[in-house]
Design a protein with these regions (language model features):
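GNAT-family acyltransferases
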Residues: 1-102, 119, 123, 158, ...
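Conserved acetyl-CoA-binding loop of GNAT-fold acetyltransferases
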Residues: 145-155
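Conserved G/P- and acidic residue-centered "switch" motifs that form tight phosphate/ATP-binding loops
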Residues: 75, 107, 137, 163
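Short, Lys/Arg-enriched C-terminal cap helix and immediately downstream tail that follows
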Residues: 128, 156-157
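Conserved acetyl-CoA-binding loop-helix of GNAT-fold acetyltransferases
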Residues: 105-119, 138-146
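Conserved GNAT acetyl-CoA-binding A-motif
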Residues: 123-132
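Short amphipathic helical patch at the helix-1/turn junction of helix-turn-helix
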Residues: 99, 134-135
């Protein structure tokens, strides 16, 4: 796997222990974690998260591989993205992206997801990539549409999430569709 990945404005690379404080700061922000399953309670928890995801072996299917999104100009951590291969079907992967509030709305999420799709389809040989999104997360819905993913399913009140039943939108993209667009 080719990590780090360089895009026009980002370096996508493994998270390290020294990134924990910055990751904790934006991941514990209510505007960010409103739609996140993981809400870190401490910097120590974030350090454990980094140790548990950044170095996950490729063969550990089902586990998330998480990477930091760093501004190329300053090496500042401004978000993270990740994927996990499905244990029951290794040709598929789920993706996710988080961008710190001060960097949202500037196309960084698009840039990161496009790079992640390239990695998964071109280098990892995935057949299908998908994302699970709360339909109330309108920014994520718009992002996945912009990068060429389509809504494959809308599950109504299918997830118990933060004290309520939430809907779940599944966005998907096949390798042949990706190759036709890129």
């Amino acid at each position: 796997m080719r990590i780090p990945i360089l895009t026009e404005r980002l370096t996508i690379r493994k998270l390290e222990r020294q990134d924990a404080e910055r990751l904790f700061r934006y991941r514990s922000n209510p505007s960010v974690n409103r739609f996140q399953f993981w809400e870190p309670a401490s910097i120590e928890e974030v350090q454990s998260f980094i140790e548990g995801t950044g170095g996950v072996a490729k063969e550990n299917f089902g586990a998330w591989r998480q990477f930091g999104l760093f501004l190329r100009a300053s090496d500042q951590l401004m978000g993270d993205c990740g994927y996990r291969s499905l244990a029951e079907d290794l040709s598929q992967a789920e993706i996710a992206v988080t961008v710190a509030p001060e960097f949202q709305g500037q196309g960084f999420g698009d840039e990161a997801v496009r790079a992640l799709l390239g990695l998964l389809f071109r280098e990892e040989g995935k057949r299908r990539v998908f994302a699970s999104v709360d339909p109330e997360n309108t920014a994520a819905v718009a992002l996945f549409k912009r990068v060429g993913m389509r809504v494959e399913a809308h599950f109504v009140e299918s997830l118990w999430f933060k004290g309520r039943w939430a809907d779940d939108l599944i966005f998907g993209l096949l390798a042949r569709e990706y190759k036709g667009k890129n």
